[in-house]
């Protein structure tokens, strides 16, 4: 059973919470201060969830310290990460927020790819 943590400002403006990603994004920003790139807006929850799927490791977990809202090539980012950051981890509040976010996006979209990715996590 998924726990939904959607934030709402109006009935038409429902988005999954991004608060669980703040620690990892903060660490990403510390490591990549000079990097300039586009970022998804919170209302682009499908694109953010697709990012989560793109970064998901074969064991179902995720690397740490990623800007999940970044419009970046996931393969290039993963290749540039130090080995210890590529591995799946629970460090820096990692993995549980991804599962929760994917579950919330599944509840909003009924798209099984988000449910399947959450279950793999």
PLM regions and their residue ranges:
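Short hydrophobic/aromatic-rich motifs at helix boundaries and adjacent loops
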Residues: 1, 20-23, 74
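Bacterial Sec-dependent N-terminal signal peptides
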Residues: 1-13
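Solvent-exposed loop and edge beta-strand segments that line ligand/cofactor-binding
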Residues: 13-24, 34-41, 80-95
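Well-ordered alpha-helical scaffold segments within catalytic/enzyme domains
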Residues: 24-40, 48, 53-54, 96-111
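Extended ligand-binding groove/face enriched in aromatic
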Residues: 56-121
């Amino acid at each position: 059973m998924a726990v939904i943590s959607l934030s709402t400002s109006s009935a038409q403006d429902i988005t999954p919470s991004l608060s669980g990603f703040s620690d990892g994004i903060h660490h990403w920003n510390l490591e990549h201060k000079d990097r300039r790139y586009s970022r998804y807006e919170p209302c682009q929850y499908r694109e953010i969830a697709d990012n989560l799927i793109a970064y998901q490791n074969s064991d179902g977990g995720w690397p740490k310290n990623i800007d999940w809202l970044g419009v970046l090539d996931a393969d290039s980012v993963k290749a540039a990460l130090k080995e210890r950051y590529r591995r799946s981890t629970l460090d820096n509040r990692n993995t549980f927020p991804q599962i929760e976010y994917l579950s919330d996006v599944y509840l909003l979209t009924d798209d099984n790819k988000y449910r399947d990715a959450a279950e793999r996590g």
